Amino acid sequence: MTIRSPEPEVKIMVEKDPVKTSFEKWAQPGHFARNLAKGPSTTTWIWNLHADAHDFDSHTNDLEDISRKIFSAHFGQLAIIFIWLSGMYFHGARFSNYESWLNDPTHVKPSAQVVWPIVGQEILNGDVGGGFQGVQITSGFFQLWRASGITSELQLYCTAVGALVFAGLMFFAGWFHYHKAAPKLAWFQNVESMLNHHLAGLLGLGSLGWAGHQIHVSLPINQLLDAGVDPEEIPLPHELILNRDLLAQTYPSFAKGLIPFFTLNWSEYSDFLTFRGGLNPITGGLWLTDTAHHHLAIAVLFLVAGHMYRTNWGIGHSTKEILEAHKGPFTGEGHKGIYEILTSSWHAQLAINLATLGSLTIIVSHHMYAMPPYPYLATDYATQLSLFTHHMWIGGFLIVGAAAHAAIFVVRDYDPTTQYNNLLDRVIRHRDTIISHLNWVCIFLGFHSFGLYIHNDTMSALGRPQDMFSDTAIQLQPIFAQWIQNTHALAPGSTAPNATAGTSLAWGGSDLVAVAGKVALAPIPLGTADFLVHHIHAFTIHVTVLILLKGVLFARSSRLIPDKANLGFRFPCDGPGRGGTCQVSAWDHVFLGLFWMYNSISVVIFHFSWKMQSDVWGSVSEQGAVSHITGGNFAQSSTTINGWLRDFLWAQASQVIQSYGSSLSAYGLLFLGAHFVWAFSLMFLFSGRGYWQELIESIVWAHNKLKVAPVTQPRALSIIQGRAVGVTHYLLGGIATTWAFFLARIVAVG
């Protein structure tokens, strides 16, 4: 840390009125690119319009203008998010049974969608309890609203209106900061100031505000709800905020005010800031006093972090200095030159952010069931399954996006002359070693993981169960995973003396928690079946990484195409006369990576769905006997491929296949339709461009004969457009099929 003199004067970081607001210009399709602004001559124009509308690099080379467009677009994105949130809250206010769910969350199912009676569609309005007919929703909003202390549909209505106001504000900000007062490039590149503001402001004050809301509003309201008080009798948020005596009735330490804080007797506040661990037995969710404590702690951490970076005052860290000091004995120049990359290539910045956010999203999906954060979430199995699946898919897409933007950075923004012998350069120089080793790992994992299943199927088919890998024959126990589970289960006694339970019941070491005779969470046993499927996870993830990393490391050049950088991020082949050079662009690696990402996530969500139904979810009798939904069949059945097909896919598809004529029939139609969308994708993926061009020319000839030929000349999709349409339908069809399969099943049996 170095001390230096403060900056002499305040720099003006904003340019006034840089771009005219012109509705005439915006009304012209393709106004952002010269070749598109001319209008269509062939049908390829509409595809290029969509491909390039947000590719700001292709509109201009001016980094400042690109930065402003991205910044402005972020406000537009936030506005859309606010509108979406407003819609969610409005449905809760206008079309839902939230208040009756709040009165009886164990018997009433959440619904916030009522289908209009058009051609018999009202069949979809199932009986969700409490005298309400509607579609059961699985987004978890009801549980979130209860946790935040919302007790009436009027409050939801007000929040919905507030979100629309914020959306308007965001749209205005997006326009204002591009057309009226646009930041200069130096402002976007001032990373220390940005780190301080984002860490202290967004994360620090944001967490502090949420902790404050939890302490003053959510905790007392939830305490009263848990005690069975009628929501209409509970004080309103403003009454709790303004009247300390009301709070002191639930949490006595409020009567002492801030004296314990300033006299450092912080333990006085332990009635509303707890460290209990485990789940609240009434709601099956985390103790809200634990989560309030957590957010307060997070706020303190980030408020400190937001004062760490050196700006006008000459003290604190410099990101550039930290990166350049980051050298080791085997790493050459270390991270020298990385700072310049991250302040001039937004693709490089985005790649890192997407990889991090994608990984965090996947971690969130695991925490949603292992540490259910909201009341009555854990016993709403359909919502649990939906939240896990949703966050897994999102995480997968974000990670593929990270590889896409990393490759775009390498093609468009990487300057080899400024990156000599730093870590990035060294990775690119020994890319052959990395990729060939990774390839070997993939082959090893693939043959061995799949081989274990094939062995089991063969032994099963030959009637030799004693020679199978299973918990009752040849055991392959996941001993490391079991050791980790055990360590966490024993932790409260040794590492956290004040905690009464572990971080999650899933680790084991305690009894299950049941709410109204339904299992919220129980210790999750791991055995041979989990060992087998975990190695399939390892295999699919490593193949995904192989494809994506090869795309990034060979994006600029390869032995096959040394001048790949000149061909750009996406190109079909290396020109005429060079056979065997098709489908080698960085874009094609992203395309292939998407399929393996889909494989990876599918195996994960199938594993989760079956494992939870078999070993966790179920009902508890008055005598304490637990009966799981599929009766614990995972350990024996999932050790063969045949078991996955017969006892998971086929057995659990019965609900969606037999859903016709019931309130779940929409899932039956979706199951059918999404299979069709998926199959439609194969038409784009298996046939070549020339086939379609010939067909089109024949059809155009017929139109000319009848003198009804269009002015815009029809063209077959380019190779890349065809593959893009193909992978889109493949993923959408596959995901919607899985969605219908999961929900029809779990809504029926959960």
From Swiss-Prot:
GO-annotated cellular components: chloroplast thylakoid membrane; photosystem I
Keywords: 4Fe-4S, Chlorophyll, Chloroplast, Chromophore, Electron transport, Iron, Iron-sulfur, Magnesium, Membrane, Metal-binding, Oxidoreductase, Photosynthesis, Photosystem I, Plastid, Thylakoid, Transmembrane, Transmembrane helix, Transport
GO biological process: photosynthesis
Binding site for chlorophyll a': H675
The keyword Metal-binding belongs to this UniProt entry's keyword annotation: yes
First-tier enzyme category under EC: oxidoreductase
Gene Ontology molecular function, alphabetical: 4 iron, 4 sulfur cluster binding; chlorophyll binding; electron transfer activity; magnesium ion binding; oxidoreductase activity
Family matches, as Pfam families: PsaA_PsaB
Keyword Lipid metabolism: no
InterPro entries for the chain: PSI_PsaA (IPR006243), PSI_PsaA/B (IPR001280), PSI_PsaA/B_CS (IPR020586), PSI_PsaA/B_sf (IPR036408)
Entry membrane topology: Multi-pass membrane protein
Protein location: Plastid, Chloroplast thylakoid membrane
EC code: 1.97.1.12
Cofactor note: P700 is a chlorophyll a/chlorophyll a' dimer, A0 is one or more chlorophyll a, A1 is one or both phylloquinones and FX is a shared 4Fe-4S iron-sulfur center.
Subunit structure: The PsaA/B heterodimer binds the P700 chlorophyll special pair and subsequent electron acceptors. PSI consists of a core antenna complex that captures photons, and an electron transfer chain that converts photonic excitation into a charge separation. The eukaryotic PSI reaction center is composed of at least 11 subunits.
NCBIfam families, per the entry: psaA
Record protein name field: Photosystem I P700 chlorophyll a apoprotein A1
Gene: psaA
